[in-house]
């Protein structure tokens, strides 16, 4: 796919420089459109024909589509590069977790509630699961409809996937929940029937084949009814699961970017079969975690898992958080003074940088240990401690500047700063610039609570 330029977009704009879109000029707006920082609809002066042409020009090679409606809506796809540094990856892959219609009703309700309530806070962001996938194992439309009903009742904002190969069972599920659930899997045997159901219900349809090449005829047939498709090239299980599956996903992404129309759709990966392929549930969860984490790195647009074990899900969600961070945006927090707990005039004063990960690690470790302290965050341009020391951003003047701006001297009765262990080289510079006594802290923020207690800093006397 040829790289789109701002001039390509500018030629379709009204060139009025009216500012109605929030940009001073149409060229600025064109640049934002190319960088996906604005939408064509933001320009009120575009006529219908120009808007349609612009939307077509800006459409990414991997189609962007939604699953669910309202609070249950998630967006998948929308990517246009092989490597994140070329632009960015968009729309983190939602993680669905399965329930089954052969489970007892209270088991379905309990697991759905676990899925709904699961959350972990990491570096200031809450990581959650995104959907519940209801799988038919009985082939009984009534039992399946009841399972869907329970899953929907016990979830508040989870997207829903309906998983069955039987069109009659799928129809029973749709009778209970029709708010744009994902229908899966459409195979060679049932693609026409499921595609019709998807078209009638305005639902996205997941296509399943055993290999990449076998997806093409499925796509061609499904496109006669709907264009909201997801592609499952056949998740592999066993010794070579990671390599084989990620190779397939990479092949589809590369073909999509090269504008092979049949592969211009989001990809779908299912790891939940490991729950039935492994006798040991711990081993099954571990295999799921390995495979799902690898597929997040290699172009999976949606994951359907079985496990709700936090230790198995956390690597997947952490991987997703890291990979789908926009590399074009500096990862930094606002410099200044932060209160940790309920500090007073005798509480210790610690210094760190405004790199997001550094700040949240330090603040999180202090908060989890119930430490009351003041945290001075200096402006290093979003760089970590060791990098900013080496690059000259972590200096005595930088610390002095934030001390003066925050009036910390009026808030504490002592003059003792604790700097990171990796900033030991600037101890003298900080003391000379600020006039404060400087103590060299720990290399790792997890050791700070013990260090503060050992050094007697939890209650500093003047």
Swiss-Prot record:
Catalytic activity field: 5,6,7,8-tetrahydrosarcinapterin + methyl-Co(III)-[corrinoid Fe-S protein] = 5-methyltetrahydrosarcinapterin + Co(I)-[corrinoid Fe-S protein] + H(+)
Co-factor binding comment: Binds 1 [4Fe-4S] cluster.
Domain (4Fe-4S) ranges: 1-60
Transmembrane domains' residue ranges: none
GO MF assignments: 4 iron, 4 sulfur cluster binding; iron ion binding; methyltransferase activity
Obligatory cofactor(s): corrinoid; [4Fe-4S] cluster
Keyword set, alphabetical order: 4Fe-4S, Cobalt, Iron, Iron-sulfur, Metal-binding, Methyltransferase, Transferase
Binding, [4Fe-4S] cluster: 18, 21, 26, 43
Domain of life: Archaea
Signal peptide (from-to): none
Enzyme Commission number(s): 2.1.1.245
Keyword Iron-sulfur carried by entry: yes
InterPro entries: 4Fe-4S_dom, Ac-CoA_synth_d_su_TIM-brl, ACDS_complex_subunit, AcylCoA_decarb/synth_gsu, AcylCoA_decarb/synth_gsu_arc, Dihydropteroate_synth-like_sf
One Pfam family per UniProt: FeS
GO BP annotations listed: acetyl-CoA catabolic process; methylation
Coiled coil regions in record: none
SUPFAM superfamilies found in the cross-reference section: Dihydropteroate synthetase-like
Functional note: Part of a complex that catalyzes the reversible cleavage of acetyl-CoA, allowing autotrophic growth from CO(2).
Subunit structure: Heterodimer of delta and gamma chains. The ACDS complex is made up of alpha, epsilon, beta, gamma and delta chains with a probable stoichiometry of (alpha(2)epsilon(2))(4)-beta(8)-(gamma(1)delta(1))(8).
The protein's name in its UniProt record: Acetyl-CoA decarbonylase/synthase complex subunit gamma
Organism name: Methanopyrus kandleri (strain AV19 / DSM 6324 / JCM 9639 / NBRC 100938)
Taxonomic lineage from the root: Archaea, Methanobacteriati, Methanobacteriota, Methanomada group, Methanopyri
């Amino acid at each position: 796919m040829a790289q789109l330029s701002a001039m390509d977009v500018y030629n379709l704009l009204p060139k009025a420089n009216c500012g109605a879109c929030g940009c001073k000029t149409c060229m600025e707006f064109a640049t934002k459109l190319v960088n996906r920082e604005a939408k064509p609809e933001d320009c009120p002066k575009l006529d219908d024909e120009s808007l349609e042409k612009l939307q077509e020009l800006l459409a990414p090679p991997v189609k962007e589509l939604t699953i669910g409606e309202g609070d249950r809506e998630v967006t998948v796809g929308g990517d246009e590069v092989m490597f994140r540094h070329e632009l960015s990856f968009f729309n983190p892959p939602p993680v669905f977790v399965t329930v089954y219609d052969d489970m007892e009703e209270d088991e379905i309700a309990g697991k759905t509630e676990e899925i709904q309530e699961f959350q972990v806070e990491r570096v200031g962001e809450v990581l959650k699961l995104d959907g519940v996938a209801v799988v038919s194992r009985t082939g009984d439309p009534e039992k399946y409809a009841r399972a869907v009903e329970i899953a929907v009742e016990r979830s508040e904002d989870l997207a829903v996937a309906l998983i069955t190969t039987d069109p009659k069972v799928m129809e029973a599920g749709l009778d209970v929940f029709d708010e744009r659930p994902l229908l899966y899997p459409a195979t060679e045997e049932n693609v026409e029937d499921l595609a019709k159901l998807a078209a009638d219900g305005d639902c996205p349809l997941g296509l399943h084949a055993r290999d990449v090449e076998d997806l093409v005829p499925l796509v061609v047939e499904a496109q006669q009814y709907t264009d909201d498709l997801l592609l499952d090239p056949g998740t592999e299980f066993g010794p070579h699961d990671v390599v084989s599956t990620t190779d397939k996903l990479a092949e589809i992404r590369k073909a999509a970017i090269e504008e092979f129309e049949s592969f211009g759709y989001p990809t779908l990966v299912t790891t939940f079969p490991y729950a039935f392929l492994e006798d040991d549930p711990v081993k099954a969860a571990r295999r799921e975690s390995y495979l799902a984490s690898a597929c997040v790195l290699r172009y999976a647009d949606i994951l359907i898992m079985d496990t709700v074990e936090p230790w198995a899900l956390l690597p997947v969600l952490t991987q997703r958080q890291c990979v789908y961070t926009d590399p074009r945006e500096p990862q930094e927090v606002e410099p200044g003074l932060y209160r940790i707990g309920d500090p007073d005039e005798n509480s210790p004063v610690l210094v760190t940088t405004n790199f997001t990960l550094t700040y949240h690690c330090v603040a999180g470790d202090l908060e989890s240990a119930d430490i009351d302290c003041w945290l001075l965050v200096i402006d290093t341009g979003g760089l970590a401690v060791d990098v900013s020391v080496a690059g000259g951003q972590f200096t005595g003047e930088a610390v002095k500047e934030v001390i003066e701006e925050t009036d910390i001297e009026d808030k504490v009765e002592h003059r003792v700063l604790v700097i990171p262990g990796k900033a030991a080289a600037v101890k003298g510079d900080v003391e000379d610039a600020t006039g404060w006594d400087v103590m060299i802290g720990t290399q790792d923020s997890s050791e700070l609570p013990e260090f503060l207690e050992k050094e007697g800093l939890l209650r500093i006397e003047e």
